[in-house]
Structure formats: structure tokens, C-alpha cells
């Protein structure tokens, strides 16, 4: 069996969960966090043998902040692919049942309130006031959030994968490898400096690697604490046979019904 592989570090930058795009101010601040923490943790890897893959929603393609980020990564000599078809895996915040949709609707309202009133306590009374009196959700993308919530985001996943994976395949020498490692991290998190090296020490096989323990860091106080969640956190590496990775139908089949990072074995 061949041990030749390609390693992506995948970062879903915009398009995760039930939040709409929060505006350029948020996006620019997020990029600065990414540069300071996430990107530096990748630049400091003891093994730099990986390719960065960042995914965004379609409207971010021509955003000046996106273009600035692309230029910055070129300046840092980081090989990176940008795709603009949203999230590249099943989003468990968009289940099809009505109960789940209503729960997510309540989450949207709560997070909108907390964004605009960070020092206030959110409860049912503030929820009613927000909806019936102030109606501030209109200012944070309420209509877009509802559209995303009820249209069935995951129903378009195969179509979105087709375009994004096609873009990757067209720009890679696919005869140079037989396996694809995809390590997921968010745009405000960090990897240990030996993460890539340790992942690549595992011979390719059809399966996944997970990070079960880690740390949480308070950037305001400099405090560091251990983090040991009871379920798998969203920092995992999926190891694909090449023929599965670049075929959207087989890509989805490969997950075998996984609907959340908590399902990754």
C-alpha cells in the first residue's frame, strides 16, 4: 500500500453554524486574530509539509478583507487555497426537523442580543422585548439567518463540494499522492508546534485522528488552563483515499453518517 499523501489544514473561515456574516468590522478583527494566533501556530510548525485550505461563503470572494488576506499569505509564502462554497462538511446546526429549526431560531436571537448587549443578562423577558419592541435582529442579518435556517443548508452540500473539490483537483498534481489528510481547525485556535509532524507519523489508513485534550487561553489575562472535553472536540484529521476525497458522492459516503465532530471515532 502506498504511503504517499497530501496534507490539508482546513479552516472554515466564514459560513459555520447559524450565524450570518457579521460585517466587515467583525471579519477584519477575525483576520487579525487568525494572523496572531492560528497562522503563527502554523508557521511555527516543526513540519511545514501541509497546504492551507480556507473556505468562505460566495459573497466573500471579492471582499477587500479576503483579498488582503490572500496577499498576506502570499507574502508569508504560505501555500493556500481559498474556496467560496461555504462549509465543506455536514453542519449539525441545520438539522431538518422542525424542533431543531426552532431551537436554532432561539439561538440566533440569543446570540444577536448578546452581541449587542454584552453586559446584559439574556432571559425570556429580554427575548420577548427584543422580538416585539426593539426588533434589533433586523440590524444583524435576521432575514439572511432565517433564509439559511429554513432552506436546508446541508441539501446543497454535494453541489458545493463539487465546485470546491474540483478547484483543488485542478490545481494539484494528483498523481503525486494516493491519500489526503484533512486536519480541521477554527480561525481562532492554535495547534501545538509538533501537531503536523505527529499526524504525519501515522501511516495512511481509512479513518480519523482526534485531539482529545488541549488548552484554553485567555488572551486578556494570559491565563492558560487544561481542556479535557467529554466528547471529541472539532480538531480532527480525516484520512481519505484520494479517489474518495475528490469525488463528492464518495466524499460524503466516506463520513458514514457522521453529523458532528462528536461523531468522529
Regions found by a protein language model. Give the residues of each.
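Short beta-strand/loop segment that forms part of the nucleotide-sugar
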Residues: 48-60, 82-87, 185
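Conserved donor-nucleotide/metal-binding helix-loop-beta segment in metal-dependent transferases, i.e.
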Residues: 196-213
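Short beta-strand-to-loop acidic/aromatic patch adjacent to the donor-nucleotide binding site
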Residues: 177-190
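Hydrophobic/aromatic residue at the end of a short beta strand that borders the catalytic acidic motif
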Residues: 191-195
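Active-site-proximal specificity loops/subdomain of glycosyltransferases
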Residues: 64-180
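Short beta-strand-to-loop element that shapes/binds the nucleotide-sugar donor at the catalytic cleft/hinge
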Residues: 209-223
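Short, acidic, metal-binding catalytic loop of nucleotide-sugar glycosyltransferases
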Residues: 37-49, 72
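Hydrophobic targeting segments
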Residues: 6-11, 22, 42, 50-55
